[in-house]
Amino acid sequence: MLRLLLFIITFHCLQTSDAISEIYEGWLDPDSTGPIQPLWMELNEDKSGQFTGWYVNRIEPDTVYFKGERAKKGIVLKVMANRTVVKEQFTLHESDSGLEGLWKPAKGYGSDIRLFKTEPDFTKTMRVSIDPNILRKGKGKQDSISDIQYLMVRKGIASIKVYRERNDGHRPWISYHVIDLIKNKEIQLTDYLIDHAFATKKIDADSHAEEVAIEQLKQYAEDELTTMQDCGMNLDQELHLDNVILYPNRTAITFDYLNVFGMHEECEYLIYPIQYTIPIEEFKACIRPGSFLSRLLIGS
């Protein structure tokens, strides 16, 4: 009996060693223009094409287990509510960078899913938790944070959209940030760009921002314009187009102009931020080779 038990254990170990194991990070994309749900997944395939593994929504505590197999329509992974009832299903296709396909719950609408092969070094960032204190530095540090949405999470970097309630009760506002999850600090994408290449793209972005800003002003009454001038707006000077934050989402880079008229912070609610978005493919020429941004967005 003991000899049989040892044989079974040895056989199981040999089978396990033949399994192919991959780790992925990526996202569910419920709305192609909205926030993502960041995911981390471990997927194991044995020699017969059967899969086991687990995933986590990186901002929630639960680990979800699944099993699956290769089928005609791709890799099908199922999360079971019990022995016979499917709670969730992934239908995935392999690509050069990882996996993509559809996630579908038992009830409700499904979501597109994109998963990239990742490295064990990033496992320490599997659970995403951003310290709100690093988002309270500088402008708006007294305002409360009502929500944080994720635009992209990959390779130890999170691009986020932060909803803020103004301390003075005026219109809520939104800020964008890129966070180094390993060092738990904010980073500026402009530090990782080729200056002359970025300057060329920024000319187009500035031109768009100026045009939109002028159109905004046409909607204001004289008394509102007077208030804005009292708050530091000076149309005789160049617009403050250098006051811009860059942030990535799934497929694009966005220029976010926070305060093109250079008004005092207490009056910024009077003007709406302006955005200019270009595809990442067009922005690649601006990225410094070998930088973290190159590894994040280009894969080199």
State each model region's role:
Residues 22-300:
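Compositionally biased intrinsically disordered regions enriched in Thr/Gly
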Residues 2-12:
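Sec-dependent N-terminal signal peptides
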